[in-house]
Amino acid sequence: MNIINLPELNYEVFFVFIELGLIFGSLGVVFLTNIVYSAFLLGLVFVCISFLYLLLDADFVATAQILIYVGAVNILIVFAVMLINKPQSLQFLPSWTVGDTITLILCTSLFFLLISMILSISWSNIFSIAQSNKIGEQVLKSSVQGIGSSLLIDFLLPFELLSIVLLVALIGAITIARREKKVKLQKNRTLQVTKDSFIL
């Protein structure tokens, strides 16, 4: 599917929906205290980023974005959170700290810096993507073939090591969850013994 060939109005509407998904998803990841909801909203952000790659006619990068970040990293985060099973607070907005103030100042400064850079660029001098479609297709084909051969020939060992790293992270989450369950069981047994001795 070549989204770049859509009519201009549909293209702009699609872009607006993607940006809204990115903005609200990112705000939800930051402000929600429930980690499970934050993880799912992070997956929404990753999907919206892959749609941006589709708008740029980079199908392979969009597919890799979904497979790696949504299919691997985000699912791993969800499984780890579900296994750890931390008690979640019912408060929607967390308490404000000094670190939050510093982060807000830095993010606001970065936002206005990006806005000033965008406004200072002369966009009329940038060539349209449609004019360089043929060159882009040739580069995409060569880059996809190059990436595939590099992953399976030159970088096969690091590629396999990445999967081992994800597996180690999942095993670590399971181990932490089992330790917490053992500690809870020991505390419950201690409390039960104390109650029984008090009754006797």
From Swiss-Prot:
It is a multi-pass membrane protein. The chain crosses the membrane at residues 13-33, 35-55, 64-84, 101-121, 156-176. It comes from the Eukaryota. Its main location: plastid. Disulfide bonds: none annotated. InterPro entries: NAD(P)H-Q_Oxidoreduct_6, NADH_UbQ/plastoQ_OxRdtase_su6, Nuo/plastoQ_OxRdtase_6_NuoJ. Its EC number is 7.1.1.-. Pfam families: Oxidored_q3. It is found in: Plastid, Chloroplast thylakoid membrane. It catalyses: a plastoquinone + NADH + (n+1) H(+)(in) = a plastoquinol + NAD(+) + n H(+)(out); a plastoquinone + NADPH + (n+1) H(+)(in) = a plastoquinol + NADP(+) + n H(+)(out). GO terms for molecular function: NADH dehydrogenase (ubiquinone) activity; quinone binding. Keywords: Chloroplast, Membrane, NAD, NADP, Plastid, Plastoquinone, Quinone, Thylakoid, Translocase, Transmembrane, Transmembrane helix, Transport. GO terms for cellular component: chloroplast thylakoid membrane. NDH shuttles electrons from NAD(P)H:plastoquinone, via FMN and iron-sulfur (Fe-S) centers, to quinones in the photosynthetic chain and possibly in a chloroplast respiratory chain. The immediate electron acceptor for the enzyme in this species is believed to be plastoquinone. Couples the redox reaction to proton translocation, and thus conserves the redox energy in a proton gradient. Belongs to the complex I subunit 6 family. NDH is composed of at least 16 different subunits, 5 of which are encoded in the nucleus. This is NAD(P)H-quinone oxidoreductase subunit 6, chloroplastic.
